[in-house]
């Protein structure tokens, strides 16, 4: 869509990347609107031709998204002649301007802009003056030849902007290596780079194509397996039909460019190698002697004020926190981790009244839960580090560290290698650290097994809480979790019920049990998305059961999914500007079909999702076990489907059942469940973190 409009006022301008938000008035209709996008050197009262479309921003409402903007050229004779005699066109006088108009006629400037060769038709116009006119029109309109060329390469305006923000001489960079943006620009993917390479005419035999393929393979395998490195053998097995010597040459080139890193037989994506090194060095900086504080009397005061009694294991953990600069606290459900942390916080405020204590967790829901349980402020790690969604950078780092004396990180088993490296970079050197987690839960989605590697390095004091305290309703849940951890016989009692069903009967049993449940306190967990008992089908059936079609409720189809007012949904992307994050669950409160907007209430934070953002939502009556991590629910339904046998590993089942607080219903194949919880892990993540820690760090005590 093209709109001719006058720029009335500038709301915001980023001079570094030319991103502008401004108020415009359409020339034909006088319609006032807000536009946002790349506009070079915006001028108030200037007329522009804007190319783009109207969108609904999730926070700022309707606005025109500018894909391309250029100043509108004069279109009547007097204005054209006056324009060509102006400062943009040195040495072009009135007679030359009149000659151009007489030769090319009305809209001659637009004609020249679209086809500069027309200037050769003007009598007595020298080559030098032709160049002056071409350059002057381009500079005035803001039309960028680089931008135009990148459009021809099949790039979207957003992708072009990413390149322009990164490189001063984009075309030179691409001419040298059209895959360079793929390696260096966050969000510029492999498929986009391949498409651009084909548009440029890069030969299929060009070695740069093989380089990019091998790098993509290394990156994808790391994400799929959770490994921080892969082996040469794995590369050779996956790159078929290519001579091994050519593969080796490609790896050597990628290493020389610092896109890959090689140690013996291990090949790392360069950033993951850097992250492991950063963590090892960071730990060394945070392991230092502290002045010990005897807190025995303080513990008694906390026991009195909180009306609790700590066992010796918990008391030792609290004392250790005040004796060490770095500590890990682990334990299964019901072992008193939260109660122990409450005591640590109370005593810390008393002993160090001027100290700054920061609580955080990897997900929004885990952070909110930590805040509720501790009565202290807590933030997500991404929010704390001022994560930038656009370029995946962090505002807090070694150059601008956090102002904290103590940091406590909950649900640490979910933290991957890259995120922990960024957190350590942002901590001041004398900051003391407490990491809390359950080492038997699922590992992080991203590469690494950080909690396990830290514990096994044996350089950080670790307290394993073992005694179970939760003996009220639902005590059978923590008992079952303990039985799975210790690989003893499973019992299903005191809040735990196993409903044995074959896969075709799982759905009927689930519907029969959940139909009278309180939706706010119940969550269904399943291991996979597809199939008769998969997440997608369960959500379809739950929508029919809990939120059927009604004339009183608006609905909207997004792809193959129908969203309806009152639906339970989950956010699939981090939106730091809205303070909502991947995994947050909310309720659809309004659907505006005309504007293509879905409004979701995430616990008193309402976010509007427009066309470009609708795919960030997914139904959430049933979610994956990974997405549930960091959360607790009063009642959990855990699906054990034989079709998901390969996914039903011990860690996943343990994580699923430990999400329940009062009631746990396991539906499916009992024999499969009891077999899988005793199987040793089939896939052990490959990392070098433990080795690196032991190489550079010695235990202080």
Regions found by a protein language model. Name each.
Residues 1-292:
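Accessory, non-ATPase domains that flank or precede helicase/AAA+ motor cores in DNA-metabolism machines
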Residues 131, 262-332, 345:
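Pre-Walker A segment
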């Amino acid at each position: 869509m093209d709109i001719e409009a006058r720029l009335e006022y500038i709301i915001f301008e980023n001079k570094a990347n030319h991103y502008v938000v401004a108020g415009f008035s359409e020339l034909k209709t006088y319609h006032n609107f807000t536009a946002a996008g790349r506009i070079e050197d915006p001028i108030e009262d200037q007329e522009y031709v804007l190319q783009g479309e109207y969108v609904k921003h999730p926070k700022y409402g309707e606005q025109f998204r500018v894909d391309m903007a250029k100043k509108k050229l004069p279109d009547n004779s007097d204005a054209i002649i006056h324009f060509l005699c102006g400062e943009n066109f040195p040495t072009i006088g009135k007679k030359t301007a009149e000659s151009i108009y007489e030769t090319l006629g009305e809209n001659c400037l637009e004609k020249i802009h679209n086809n500069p060769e027309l200037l050769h038709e003007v009598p007595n116009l020298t080559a030098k003056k032709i160049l002056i006119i071409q350059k002057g029109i381009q500079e005035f309109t803001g039309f960028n030849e680089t931008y135009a060329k990148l459009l021809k390469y099949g790039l979207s305006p957003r992708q072009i902007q990413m390149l322009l923000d990164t490189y001063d001489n984009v075309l030179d960079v691409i001419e040298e290596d059209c895959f360079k943006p793929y390696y260096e620009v966050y969000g510029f993917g492999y498929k986009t780079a391949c498409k651009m390479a084909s548009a440029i005419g890069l030969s299929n035999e060009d070695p740069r194509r093989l380089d990019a393929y091998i790098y993509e393979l290394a990156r994808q395998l790391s994400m799929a397996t959770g490994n921080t490195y892969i082996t040469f053998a794995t590369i050779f097995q996956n790159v078929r039909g290519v001579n091994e010597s050519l593969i080796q040459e490609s790896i050597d080139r990628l290493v020389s460019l610092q896109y890959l890193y090689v140690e013996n037989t291990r090949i790392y994506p360069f950033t993951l190698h850097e992250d492991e090194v950063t963590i090892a060095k960071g730990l060394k900086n945070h392991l230092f002697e502290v002045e010990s504080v005897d807190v025995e009397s303080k513990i008694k005061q906390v026991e009195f004020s909180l009306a609790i009694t700590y066992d010796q294991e918990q008391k030792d953990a609290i004392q250790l926190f005040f004796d060490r600069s770095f500590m890990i606290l682990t334990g299964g459900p019901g072992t008193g981790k939260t109660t122990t942390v409450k005591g640590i916080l109370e005593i810390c405020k008393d002993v160090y009244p001027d100290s700054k204590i920061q609580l955080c967790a990897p997900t929004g829901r885990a952070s909110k839960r930590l805040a509720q349980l501790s009565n202290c402020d807590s933030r997500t790690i991404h929010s704390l580090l001022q994560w930038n969604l656009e370029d995946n950078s962090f505002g807090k780092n070694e150059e601008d560290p956090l102002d904290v004396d103590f940091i406590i990180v909950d649900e640490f088993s979910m933290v991957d290698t890259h995120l922990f490296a960024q957190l350590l970079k942002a901590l001041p050197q004398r900051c003391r650290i407490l990491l809390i987690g359950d080492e038997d839960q699922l590992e992080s989605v991203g590469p690494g097994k950080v909690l396990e590697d830290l514990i096994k390095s044996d350089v950080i004091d670790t307290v394993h809480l073992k005694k179970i305290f939760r003996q009220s309703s639902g005590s059978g849940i923590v008992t079952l979790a303990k039985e799975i951890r210790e690989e003893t016989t499973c019992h299903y009692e005191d809040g735990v019920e196993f409903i044995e069903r074959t896969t075709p009967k799982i759905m009927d049993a689930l519907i029969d049990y959940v139909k009278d449940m309180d939706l706010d306190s119940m969550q269904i967990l399943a291991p996979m998305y597809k199939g008769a008992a998969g997440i997608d089908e369960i959500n379809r059936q739950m929508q029919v059961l809990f939120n059927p079609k009604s004339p009183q409720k608006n609905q909207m189809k997004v792809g193959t999914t129908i969203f309806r007012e009152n639906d339970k949904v989950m956010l699939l992307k981090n939106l730091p500007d809205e303070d909502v994050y991947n995994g947050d669950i909310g309720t659809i409160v309004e659907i505006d079909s005309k504007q293509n907007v879905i409004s979701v209430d995430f616990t008193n934070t309402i976010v509007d999702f427009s066309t470009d953002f609708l795919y960030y939502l997914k139904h959430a009556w049933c979610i994956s076990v990974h997405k549930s991590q960091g959360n607790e629910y009063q009642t959990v339904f855990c699906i054990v489907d034989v079709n998901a046998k390969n996914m039903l590993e011990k860690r996943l089942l343990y994580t699923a059942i430990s999400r329940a607080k009062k009631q746990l219903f396991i539906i499916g194949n009992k024999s499969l469940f009891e077999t899988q919880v005793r199987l040793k892990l089939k896939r052990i993540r490959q990392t070098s973190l433990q080795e690196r820690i032991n190489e550079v760090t010695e235990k202080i005590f």
